[in-house]
Structure formats: C-alpha cells, structure tokens
Amino acid sequence: METDKRWSLAGKTALVTGGTRGIGRAVVEELAKFGAKVHTCSRNQEELNACLNDWKANGLVVSGSVCDASVRDQREKLIQEASSAFSGKLNILINNVGTNVRKPTVEYSSEEYAKIMSTNLESAFHLSQIAHPLLKASGVGSIVFISSVAGLVHLSSGSIYGATKGALNQLTRNLACEWASDNIRTNCVAPWYIKTSLVETLLEKKEFVEAVVSRTPLGRVGEPEEVSSLVAFLCLPASSYITGQVISVDGGFTVNGFSYAMKP
C-alpha cells in the first residue's frame, strides 16, 4: 500500500456520537482533516448548528443530526440517517457519548443507574449492533469505543461509571474476535482526566488538579486532541493489524506504582 494511502481517510465515512464538545468534537475534526466524510450528533440543535457552521467555514465535510443516544428509537433513527448520508456503507463508528453522576454507591437512585448505563454502555452496544450491516458493507470497518481508565482501575468518579467503562473494554475484545471475519476492527481508547465539559467543574478546583497531576508521570492534565489523534490512528489503514486493544491515554497514570525518593 502506498504510504500516502496508509495515512489518509479520503473516501471513508464516519459516524461520531456526541461530536460537538470535548473529545467528540476533537475526533470529528481529526477524522475530517484526514479526509473522511463525518456525520455526528448532539442533543442540542443550537450547539450542533454552531459546530456545523464552524466546520463548514473551515472546509471540513461534516453533517449532523439531533439525537439523545440514551434513547433506543433515536439511536435507530441516527443509524438510518447515517445510512442515507453514506449510501448504506459506513467505515468508522466512534462510540464517544458518555455521562456520569459522582456519588457514593449507596446513594445512587435506580433512575441514575439506568441513565448512566443507557448512555455509556447500552448506546455503544446497540449502535455497534445496528451499524454492523453498514460497517460490513463498507468492506473495511473500524469501531472505536471511548472508555476511561475508570474501567481499568478504581477511581472516585463513581462505581456505575467505572462498571460501564469496564464493560466497554470487554465488549471491545469480544467484537474484535466476533467481527474480524467481517473485516471490522474494534479498539478502545481509555483516557485519564482530559480538559472537557464532563470534568470542567472538577478541574476548576486547584487541590483536585494538584492531586491528579501528582499521580500522573507526565505532570499535567490531557487535552482532547491528545485523545483524538489516537482515535484517528486506529481508524487509518496504517493500523490495519490492530484490533481488540484497550489503549490508555493517561500521561502514565495507570502504570504509576509507588515511588519514594530515598534521602542519601
């Protein structure tokens, strides 16, 4: 394969959920800059329109629709819209949408449990399931789940959130094996604290940021573009032999054990 084709998404199609903020927006822009035609969604029409106008002004080929990914019939409508936009074929599915409620396990309500599960896990499973025919029809498919290091190690971000992310990590491995014969690769990206709206309130607290940084070997919080670059790579032809992997983007957090500088 020619080098330029290995590092290009020209002619490819992509669906990115939750693409108007944070990591999702960075992924939309990254894929579009590599040449992909992208469709994304948001629950907020005004926010979506503002993004679409901005992308158009910057020469990026992006379309969009309103969708609450936690609602089953809206997910089905989203896939129908993507199918119509891309003539029944989809090369890339990025399951990015997510939410969280931070509180002790004993304080969660059944409604909060259902909301986090339906948004983070059920949406990703169902969208992958109903997008499968489109991914298979494209001849070369790639799914990327946006998980979290909370699915790998304990964080105080909440047990339900961690459970959904751990499930995504295993779903990645299962689909990678089950759908390999359909030429669909499945991978997962697990970020640590990234500057997004999901955690912006936390990152406004100096003591919290200092605690995060103290456990992060690279000594800082991550940027959305540092996640989207890996997501894009996992969709490129250059990554064609990579599947079933859960890759942390965490500044070294998950490999940081105990260290203590001994005084002479």
From Swiss-Prot:
Transcription listed as a keyword: no
Write the record's keywords in alphabetical order, separated by commas.
NADP, Oxidoreductase
Answer yes or no on keyword Electron transport.
no
* Any one GO molecular-function label of the UniProt entry: oxidoreductase activity
Q: What class of enzyme is it?
A: oxidoreductase
Q: Where do the annotations place NADP(+) binding?
A: 15-39
Source organism, top-level taxon: Eukaryota
Q: Which SUPFAM superfamilies match?
A: NAD(P)-binding Rossmann-fold domains
Residues binding substrate = S148
Pfam families given for it?
Answer: adh_short_C2 (PF13561)
Q: What's one GO-annotated cellular component?
A: plasma membrane
Catalytic site:
Y161
Name the EC number(s).
1.1.1.-
Tell me the protein family, please: Belongs to the short-chain dehydrogenases/reductases (SDR) family. SDR65C subfamily.
Full protein name: Tropinone reductase homolog At5g06060
Organism of derivation = Arabidopsis thaliana
Q: What is the lineage of its organism?
A: Eukaryota, Viridiplantae, Streptophyta, Embryophyta, Tracheophyta
